[in-house]
């Protein structure tokens, strides 16, 4: 059986209109994005986690933080998030993409794992 490449693509940015730098706000000395990446890392079904951020210079701080924590970063369009996902998928070539937003640090990893099991077992396209 061919192993499926299952990637979590986390969309993130610092330039939120309502709350600037939202993903770097801290809860108990951890940024929201750190909390999220730690949760996602607990999955034994996700092969790789890639954080997709805009190419804008003001996002360099976020890229540095993510890489310091040992995660890959893909940079793409600020305004066209779908294009960012599309281009990242061309680079990483996953069989399945789990889309996660970085401003949601309370993602339940059990739900994510159950979702992965279902999509792989049923051979869903998306």
Mark where each language-model region is.
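Conserved donor nucleotide-binding strand/loop of the catalytic core
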Residues: 67-80, 90
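N-terminal nucleotide-binding beta1-loop-alpha1 segment
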Residues: 1-20
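Short aromatic/hydrophobic "clamp" motif used to bind/position activated sugar donors
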Residues: 97-98
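A short, N-terminal amphipathic alpha-helix
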Residues: 32-49, 62-64, 68-69
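Conserved donor-nucleotide/metal-binding helix-loop-beta segment in metal-dependent transferases, i.e.
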Residues: 85-87, 92, 106-126
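Hydrophobic/aromatic residues located in beta-strands of well-ordered beta-sheets
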Residues: 8, 49-51
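Substrate/cofactor-recognition hotspot
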Residues: 103
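A conserved acidic beta->alpha catalytic loop
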Residues: 54-59
């Amino acid at each position: 059986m061919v192993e499926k490449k299952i990637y979590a693509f986390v969309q993130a940015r610092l330039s939120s209109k309502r709350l600037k730098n939202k993903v770097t706000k801290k809860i108990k000395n951890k940024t929201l994005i750190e909390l999220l990446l730690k949760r996602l890392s607990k999955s034994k079904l996700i092969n790789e986690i890639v954080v997709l951020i805009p190419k804008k210079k003001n996002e360099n701080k976020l890229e540095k933080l993510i890489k310091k924590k040992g995660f890959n970063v893909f940079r793409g369009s600020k305004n066209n998030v779908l294009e960012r996902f599309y281009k990242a998928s061309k680079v990483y070539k996953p069989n399945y993409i789990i889309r996660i937003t970085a401003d949601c640090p309370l993602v339940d990893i059990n739900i994510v794992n159950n979702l992965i099991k279902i999509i792989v077992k049923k051979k869903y396209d998306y």
